[in-house]
């Protein structure tokens, strides 16, 4: 391929081909240049993709997307959906403050969940993108939905969700999300960065594990009624783990799935199955119905800082 430093040797020809209606990948093939390189330099010159020439698209059905539809979705967190998706983006979203881009990418088996987020944003007709990754374990495909909105990025920032948040985020205050909606936020976060497992070796005990910053998880534990619960290190990094097991995990999961209308289906199905197995134990059933509920029902879960 032509070295990138020799861009002057091919860029004029690329512009000519572009103006003839040729899409990026065809230009790349004809000039023996990487497609991403062609795309980068043409976009730098102000040229957009020749969408009408992309295969399998009906030209008559093409139209510009009205991204303003999504501008106000996180202005106020006042519904279950908003609280849930804010939690999911906290855990597994990508927010580019410099380019005003919001993106969500999940593995192929969770494609329908990416479509749910797209629908929530009011952009059903916007195409999902696929990303293929090859490792020693084989090839995997992710589905990604992204859109650009300066207003949405600003609102997410006000809610504590921003770029490079992995080591910085704090649990949102009740000024951002009300007590009535906080479990929907937690469910979104768990769907994005939590796991529900069983004890193994014949054990029916459920374990709920969530990753996050120490500051975030300290408040997360407090809201759930485990203020003094120990946090564990994760792979020798500053990221921490909150681990809740046994009947207490069932109690928490029951709370976050109560009256829920949106969730990651595979994780919800796993919760139902492991709950069924755990409650086959009379002791677990008694604890859940009695002492645990009483112990956690009236804990002080006030959150004052974001």
Predicted segments — roles?
Residues 1-306:
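Internal intein/HINT superfamily modules and their associated LAGLIDADG
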